[in-house]
A protein has these predicted regions:
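Loop/turn-to-beta-strand initiation segments
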Residues: 109-113, 138-144
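Clamp-loader machinery-focused feature within the broader ASCE/P-loop NTPase space
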Residues: 1-125
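Residues immediately C-terminal
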Residues: 121-122, 136, 152
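Conserved catalytic/switch belt of AAA+ P-loop NTPases
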Residues: 103, 128-142
């Protein structure tokens, strides 16, 4: 919860105002802590003075919608407390089920809250079903939509919600999170995680947990070398491992994207165009990667080619 003082002030000011808006969009890049904020804010919203409050997961007036496990095997992993793969979207059936639960009044007080984590992952039918509830909210019900890319939401949904924006954290705040959550990190990994975080402590933690320091070093080398003999691209395939899961693949793409973003801040006009084109290619790759089962070697070769394309030509280097 580091670095969100402005968001808390806006939220608590709205609560104190007596006319709390029923729909809220928590907008900002992934990994800033929006979902954690939503849980804490929702619990604060529904709490009644003098009424004991159950733990969040057991609270009858707090609902969290997120993509379900991908299959029965992943359900078992979830139930066993293990990491599990989810479906790509929140389904319309999930939204409708919540709608049925909201037909009654809140249980412990006058308010209840529904957290959608995240609004970017709603099926088309689910968006329409949610929109109906936003247009005619059930009594005492408040919606908090965690959204990584605001432009993906329909304008009709955005127009019915207050937008609470979350901004990237400073390098110092990201480092505070890293030191608190992973104090065992060596200095090289800490520096690499900070370099690709882009103000997102979640991105820094994912990078460190996945052990992608070697990848980031190769990424940086590729931005300075056209890699004519493909040696660096070959090294990428070995660095990510033989069978990386989807989370590791996505973390690798995001680390490459943020390596380009960081280079953009130091580039001259001539280099900037190549970097922008490489960035666009990485964004497109991130969009299709969850849908297609990429061979890890092919994926890393494509990432490496995009980075190498942004490196200076021999003529440009002169």
């Amino acid at each position: 919860m580091i670095g969100h003082d402005d968001a808390w002030r806006a939220w608590r000011s709205a609560m104190a105002g007596g006319r709390m808006h029923h729909g809220w969009i928590l907008s900002g890049r992934e990994g800033l802590g929006k979902a954690s904020f939503a849980r804490a804010a929702a619990a604060e919203l529904v709490a009644e003075p003098g009424v004991p409050q159950p733990a969040f997961e057991m609270h009858p007036d707090l609902y969290v919608l997120r993509p379900l496990p991908a299959n029965d095997d992943e359900v078992k992993k979830r139930d066993d407390g293990k990491p599990y793969v989810t479906k790509r979207n929140i389904s319309v059936d999930q939204i409708r089920e919540i709608g049925r639960r909201l037909n009654t009044r809140p249980t412990l007080g006058a308010r209840r809250a529904v957290i959608v984590d995240c609004g970017d992952q709603l099926e088309k039918g689910a968006v329409n079903a949610l929109l109906k509830m936003l247009e005619e909210p059930p009594q005492g019900t408040f919606f908090l939509l965690v959204v990584h890319v605001l432009g993906r939401l329909l304008p009709t949904v955005r127009s019915r919600c207050q937008i609470l924006r979350f901004h990237p954290l400073s390098d110092a705040d990201v480092m505070r999170v890293l030191d608190a959550e992973m104090p065992q990190l060596d200095n090289e990994t800490r520096a690499a995680a900070l370099a690709v975080a882009g103000g997102s402590p979640g991105a820094a933690l994912t990078f460190a947990e996945q052990g992608l320091g070697k990848l980031q070093a190769i990424y940086s080398a590729l931005l300075g070398d056209r890699d004519g003999d493909l040696a660096l691209r070959g090294a990428l395939a070995g660095a990510i491992g033989a069978r990386p899961d989807r989370e590791r693949q996505m973390a690798a793409i995001e680390a490459a994207r943020m390596t380009v973003v960081r280079a953009l801040g130091q580039a001259d006009d001539h280099a900037r165009l190549r970097l922008v084109e490489a960035h666009a290619g990485l964004v497109s790759l991130a969009a299709v990667a969850p849908t297609y089962n990429f061979d890890s070697g092919l994926l890393m070769t494509q990432i490496g080619s995009l980075l190498a394309s942004a490196a200076p030509t021999r003529e440009g280097a002169r």
